């Protein structure tokens, strides 16, 4: 298309407010005329589109030049990633039905960038994964299903929906006719606790294909299962930078403390992706020297994406260390409560024991005649209770 102004020079709040003043018919006219650039303002107008405007756009959608439809979805995906307040769900759903596969892929990726979790998308993505005529669309749909596997694992989906979703992903991961399609299905299944998944991850990890090894590391990180710690650490020094990068990412997601020293080394890796993955992983694990390293790298950074990642990493470190501190405080309070309860139990036991001992000593000092008098006195006490009028006794 592409957008006319650099994003960093834009006042987002003003754009969002100003965009609502633009007649939607004018936006459609501009889209239809390939000689007119589409202003950034119009992209904000497409956020949270009304049903009426969406219906209007649908009538003209296929008349918009193909190159512009493709470019539009790329731009909307970028905007959705940069501003979480923007929602392009309406136009994303419209583009899912586009006859062009690149537009359909753009639609899926835009909905993913918006973190759209509407449950009806599960069946739509499953249908695309299994039956779309274009392989790239099937691959994109398999990747998009990962967020719903995660929701299923968090018990946010009905059991029957969860089972259907996992069954169909497992079928593709095991029997798909394309290796990348199988890999993306495996990556999405990484969130699942199904019994079949660990074996699939193990098979992918042990294959000589570096692409399958990379996918296995993605699935390991998503599993949250420490059973994979040793395999992940073993790949941190791999000669393939893609594998090193995903191993670093998985180490962070699994919180592998033993990987910290290797991650510090990878933070100096010649490959930028490896370096950034290592820095992010360190922000997840935390510990001595991490904050200093992130702050130093932020001061040195010039690239916008690197600056953004480092700022996010520092925020992430703050969050993780805060959560850790709260957990420690909770453990200390629990331990203190347990110590108090143990001490209280011991005191009560001692008091009971002392009372029993005193009573035994008292009884031992009584001769038989005194003991009989003691019992008679107790009987008189109970007789007193029997003789008292209940109303007088309790008022």
Question: Where are the language model's segments positioned?
Answer:
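Alpha-helix N-cap/helix-start positions at coil->helix boundaries
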Residues: 36, 66-70, 101-102, 133-136, ...
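Amphipathic alpha-helical scaffolding segments comprising HEAT/armadillo-like alpha-solenoid repeats
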Residues: 9, 13, 18-26, 49-61, ...
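Alpha-solenoid HEAT/ARM repeat scaffold
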Residues: 40, 70-74, 105-106, 139-143, ...
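DE-rich, low-complexity intrinsically disordered acidic tracts
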Residues: 1-34, 41-45, 80-82, 284, ...
């Amino acid at each position: 298309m592409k957008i006319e102004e650099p994003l960093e020079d834009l006042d987002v709040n003003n754009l969002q407010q100003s965009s609502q003043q633009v007649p939607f018919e004018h936006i459609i006219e501009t889209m239809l005329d390939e000689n007119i650039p589409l202003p950034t303002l119009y992209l904000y107008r497409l956020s949270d589109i009304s049903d009426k405007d969406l219906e209007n756009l649908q009538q003209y959608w296929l008349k918009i030049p193909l190159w512009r439809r493709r470019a539009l979805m790329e731009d909307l995906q970028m905007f959705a990633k940069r501003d979480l307040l923007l929602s392009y769900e309406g136009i994303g759903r419209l583009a899912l039905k586009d006859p062009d596969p690149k537009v359909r892929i753009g639609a899926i990726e835009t909905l993913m960038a918006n973190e759209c979790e509407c449950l009806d998308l599960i069946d739509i993505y499953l249908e695309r994964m299994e039956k779309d005529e274009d392989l790239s669309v099937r691959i994109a749909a398999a990747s998009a299903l990962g967020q719903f596997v995660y929701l299923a694992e968090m018990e946010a989906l009905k059991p029957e929906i969860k089972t259907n979703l996992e069954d169909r992903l497992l079928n593709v991961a095991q029997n798909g006719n394309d290796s990348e399609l199988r890999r993306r299905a495996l990556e999405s299944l990484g969130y699942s606790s199904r019994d079949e998944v660990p074996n699939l991850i193990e098979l992918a990890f042990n294959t000589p294909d570096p692409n399958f090894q990379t996918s296995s590391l993605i699935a390991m990180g998503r599993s949250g299962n420490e059973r994979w710690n040793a395999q992940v650490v073993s790949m941190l020094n791999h000669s393939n930078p893609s594998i090193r990068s995903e191993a670093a990412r998985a180490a962070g997601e699994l919180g592998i403390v033993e990987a910290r020293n290797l991650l510090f080394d990878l933070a100096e890796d010649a490959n930028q992706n490896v370096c950034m993955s290592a820095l992010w992983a360190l922000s997840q694990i935390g510990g001595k020297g991490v904050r200093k390293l992130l702050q130093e790298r932020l001061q040195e950074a010039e690239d916008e994406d690197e600056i953004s990642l480092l700022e996010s990493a520092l925020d992430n470190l703050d969050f993780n260390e805060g959560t850790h501190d709260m957990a420690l405080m909770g453990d200390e309070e629990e331990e203190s409560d347990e110590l108090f309860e143990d001490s209280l139990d011991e005191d009560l036991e001692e008091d009971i024991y002392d009372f029993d001992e005193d009573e035994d000593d008292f009884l031992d000092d009584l001769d038989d005649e005194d003991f009989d008098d003691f019992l008679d006195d107790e009987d008189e006490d109970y007789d007193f209770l029997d003789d008292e009028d209940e109303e007088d006794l309790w008022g």
